């Protein structure tokens, strides 16, 4: 997304954030973009991006393992990692964190209570996995961990898309 582009007040701007912006948040970005494209009510109506708390992977593509697992489900993860910054709160309507640490870090990046009110935990939107309160980081895990992360993100993004369609988010 071009940060210099003028914000369209009729569109919803969503930012997904994880620790390094190479596993969970780019997956959420890719999944949400595909869900929006597949939904005629949302196509062209939402702008989606992702970022990381840290800058370690800036400029890199998502982790190859996440890209491979996502590709098997039909998602193209081709964004480049970047670090979240305070100005993101000017641009985005909702900022989703993946776990408690992300949420706490985002609250520190936010400059005021209005910006903090934009922060949500993506797991709060899961409807099929009530046993999870976060989207666990698969980075040090196995293929099963990447599949689980994708399952949880898909679940939450379906609900986010549903609420966006009904304008209840």
Listing of model-derived features with the role each one plays in the protein:
Residues 2-91, 162-169:
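Conserved active-site segments centered on acidic
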Residues 25, 99-100:
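Helix N-cap/beta->alpha junction signal
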Residues 2-6, 94, 100-169:
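Phosphate-binding/catalytic loops
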């Amino acid at each position: 997304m071009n940060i210099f582009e003028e914000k369209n007040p009729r569109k919803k701007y969503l930012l997904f954030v994880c620790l390094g912006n190479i596993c969970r948040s780019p997956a959420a970005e890719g999944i949400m973009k595909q869900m929006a494209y597949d939904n005629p009510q949302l196509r062209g109506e939402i702008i989606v991006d992702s970022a990381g708390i840290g800058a370690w992977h800036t400029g890199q593509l998502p982790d190859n393992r996440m890209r491979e697992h996502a590709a098997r489900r039909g998602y193209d993860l081709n964004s480049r990692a970047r670090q979240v910054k305070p100005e993101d709160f000017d641009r985005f309507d909702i900022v989703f964190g993946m776990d408690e640490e992300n949420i706490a870090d985002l609250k520190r990046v936010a400059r005021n209570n209005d910006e903090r009110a934009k922060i949500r935990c993506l797991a709060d939107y899961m409807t099929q996995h009530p046993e999870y309160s976060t989207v666990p980081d698969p980075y040090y895990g196995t293929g099963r961990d990447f599949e689980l992360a994708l399952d949880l993100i898909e679940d939450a993004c379906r609900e986010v898309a549903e609420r966006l369609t009904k304008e209840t988010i």
